């Protein structure tokens, strides 16, 4: 498998956004500004809450990040949907890490809860993805639960995140 490691740097994640990490048919991450992590610090095929795979990734918060200027004026907060998207990004990244091919698409989430916020004064966001199941048939799909932590406190939880890989995304 191409580039199958337990950690990835920002440069690696940017290579993924260009389609250079998991081969020409592997899934890609979004490019900045939508790339919502700076590094993946742990990836395992076993482990996590269900012993079916685990990812831990981080985003360093800077007070001048693009979303703070528009969400909201005079009340800056990172949009919760960006944290949710980061969890979907990581599920798709994991499918590529396992050797899956195709274009990643978020397929849903059962439940999302927000119990905190990410502010310009925050320092670090950490994502935890616990895989429940991987389906590897005509459609490759990952199902996982996720948590988002800000400066050590869990502030978002998501259950039953789903991402699929499509050989032809026009039929999605």
Curated annotation (Swiss-Prot):
It catalyses: a (3R)-hydroxyacyl-[ACP] = a (2E)-enoyl-[ACP] + H2O; (3R)-hydroxydecanoyl-[ACP] = (2E)-decenoyl-[ACP] + H2O; (2E)-decenoyl-[ACP] = (3Z)-decenoyl-[ACP]. InterPro entries: FabA, FabA_FabZ, HotDog_dom_sf. The active site is at 71. GO terms for cellular component: cytoplasm. GO terms for biological process: unsaturated fatty acid biosynthetic process. It is found in: Cytoplasm. It holds the Pfam family FabA. The keyword Signal does not apply. Its EC number is 4.2.1.59, 5.3.3.14. Pathway: Lipid metabolism; fatty acid biosynthesis. Keywords: Cytoplasm, Fatty acid biosynthesis, Fatty acid metabolism, Isomerase, Lipid biosynthesis, Lipid metabolism, Lyase. The keyword Lipid metabolism applies. GO terms for molecular function: (3R)-hydroxyacyl-[acyl-carrier-protein] dehydratase activity; trans-2-decenoyl-acyl-carrier-protein isomerase activity. Belongs to the thioester dehydratase family. FabA subfamily. Homodimer. Necessary for the introduction of cis unsaturation into fatty acids. Catalyzes the dehydration of (3R)-3-hydroxydecanoyl-ACP to E-(2)-decenoyl-ACP and then its isomerization to Z-(3)-decenoyl-ACP. Can catalyze the dehydratase reaction for beta-hydroxyacyl-ACPs with saturated chain lengths up to 16:0, being most active on intermediate chain length. This is 3-hydroxydecanoyl-[acyl-carrier-protein] dehydratase. It comes from Blochmanniella pennsylvanica (strain BPEN). The gene is fabA.
């Amino acid at each position: 498998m191409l580039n199958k490691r337990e950690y990835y740097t920002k440069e690696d994640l940017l290579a993924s956004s260009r389609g250079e990490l998991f081969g020409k048919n592997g899934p890609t991450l979004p490019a900045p500004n939508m790339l919502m992590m700076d590094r993946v610090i742990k990836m395992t095929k076993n482990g996590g809450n269900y012993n079916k795979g685990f990812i831990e990734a981080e985003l360093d918060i800077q007070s001048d990040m693009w979303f703070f200027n528009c969400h909201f004026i005079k009340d800056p907060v990172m949009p919760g949907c960006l944290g949710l998207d980061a969890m979907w990004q990581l599920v798709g990244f994991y499918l590529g890490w396992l050797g899956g091919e195709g274009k990643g698409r978020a397929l849903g989430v059962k439940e999302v809860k927000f119990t905190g916020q990410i502010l310009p004064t925050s320092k670090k966001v950490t994502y935890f993805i616990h895989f429940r199941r991987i389906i590897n048939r005509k459609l490759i799909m990952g199902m996982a639960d996720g948590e988002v932590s800000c400066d050590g406190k869990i502030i978002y939880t998501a259950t039953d995140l789903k991402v699929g890989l499509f050989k032809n995304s026009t039929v999605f």
